From Swiss-Prot:
This is DNA-directed RNA polymerase subunit alpha. Its EC number is 2.7.7.6. Signal peptide: none annotated. It comes from Wolbachia sp. subsp. Brugia malayi (strain TRS). It catalyses: RNA(n) + a ribonucleoside 5'-triphosphate = RNA(n+1) + diphosphate. One of its GO terms (cellular component) is DNA-directed RNA polymerase complex. Belongs to the RNA polymerase alpha chain family. It is an enzyme of class 2 (transferase). Gene3D superfamilies: 5' to 3' exonuclease, C-terminal subdomain, DNA-directed RNA polymerase, insert domain, RNA polymerase, RBP11-like subunit. The keyword Nucleotidyltransferase applies. Residues 267-355 are annotated as: Alpha C-terminal domain (alpha-CTD). The lineage of its organism: Bacteria, Pseudomonadati, Pseudomonadota, Alphaproteobacteria, Rickettsiales. Homodimer. The RNAP catalytic core consists of 2 alpha, 1 beta, 1 beta' and 1 omega subunit. When a sigma factor is associated with the core the holoenzyme is formed, which can initiate transcription. GO terms for biological process: DNA-templated transcription.
């Protein structure tokens, strides 16, 4: 791979310190944890830490209650006979409900209770498409023989949608005016992140002690783990940066010294090798086979997100493949013009014969 001025990309990349796989240091709570990445070039920890923190706080997808309906109630500025909390307090409590949607972006839940009792979030009826995380959350307190029937509207989103903008919610569009009369909007905090901070410490590589160590302290709402939060933020950054890579850098045949017979192949001979030669684990090899990825040239054009969508293909397999490709001076997400070449099998045989 070359820059437009002919400078090999990998010549410059190889001079940078590459971090090891991230280390997760969990606390007693599954919602809190430290994510450690080292070693990094001096200054890189600050750059990466700030970017990851901002993305985690602003752009991760989560689920939240955006509205409720209570039988017999048309607005929140009222009270319910026999219920200790007024409707405004109930609305505020529902805004603190943390749930996780699976396989759907919008869900309608039901809650029915009869007093005397404390109505908790764990009493909400759910199915395999929705799970409640904070089941001990107090919603309200019912008196003797008081009944409460509530409909709860949950959706996936990002950021924060206040009640002043609730009509911008796309899931309200199917509702008619009659339905909206008794609909009580709730401030929807979709972000699954409670807080994120980072610090930079020194890291050592051999005798060099001026490298960086990045430590991200992440606290979530329990719907995702700290490591999942960092993983999602990194994927978002990767997708946003991908156009810069594909538009400014193009792949050209490597000019490293190699046998003269390779010059007639038209492609870097490494790309014509079959993935069988990469000596991957059985799981990784089978995943590539199932996706009809035969040559290394086929593989390097896949992005990380595409690979992770492959059945039975996880991050361990991804890291294995990235490490092997890195040894060849290659990476995932490369743009190779005119691939695959005509008569690729014949070209591959030529390469094998030259070997």
């Amino acid at each position: 791979m070359y820059y437009d001025d002919g400078i090999p990309v990998f010549d410059s990349l190889d001079k940078l310190t590459k971090p090891n796989s991230m280390k997760v240091v969990s606390s007693d709570s599954s919602e809190k944890g430290d994510i450690v990445l080292e070693p990094l070039e001096s200054g890189f920890a600050l750059t990466l830490g700030n970017a990851l923190r901002r993305v985690m706080l602003s752009s991760l997808i989560g689920s939240a209650v955006y509205g409720i309906k209570i039988d017999g109630i048309t607005h929140e500025f009222t009270s319910i006979q026999g219920v200790r909390e007024d409707v405004t307090d109930i609305v505020l409590n529902m805004g603190m409900l943390r749930c996780k949607l699976n396989g759907t972006s919008n869900k309608c839940l039901s809650l029915s209770a009869k007093g005397p009792c404390q109505v908790l979030a764990g009493m909400i009826e759910t199915d395999d498409q929705c799970s409640i995380v904070n089941k001990d959350l107090l919603i309200c307190t019912l008196g003797q023989d008081v009944e409460l029937n509530m409909t709860i509207y949950v959706a996936s989103g990002k950021g924060y949608l206040p009640v002043t903008k609730y009509k911008e919610n796309e899931f309200l569009k199917p509702m008619n005016e009659q339905d909206l009369i008794s609909f009580i909007p709730v401030n929807a905090l979709y972000s699954p992140i409670n807080r994120v901070s980072y610090r930079v410490e020194n890291s050592r590589v051999g005798q060099v002690t001026d490298k960086d160590k990045l430590i991200l302290s992440v606290e979530t709402d329990g719907t995702i783990s700290p490591s999942q939060a960092v993983d999602s933020a990194a994927r978002i950054l990767q997708e946003q940066l991908q156009p810069f890579i594909s538009s400014d850098i193009s792949y050209k045949k490597s000019q490293v010294s190699s046998p003269s017979g390779y010059k007639d192949l038209g492609y870097d001979p490494i790309l014509l090798r079959k993935v069988d030669e990469m000596e991957l684990s059985v799981r990784s090899h089978n995943c590539l086979k199932n996706e009809n990825i035969t040559y290394i040239g086929d593989l390097v054009q896949k992005t990380e997100s595409e690979m992770l969508r492959t059945a039975n293909f996880g991050r361990k397999s991804l890291n294995e493949i990235k490490a092997v490709l890195n040894n060849f001076g290659l990476s995932l997400g490369m743009d190779i013009p005119d691939w695959p070449p005509k008569d690729i099998d014949e070209l591959a045989r030529q390469h094998t014969d030259e070997d």
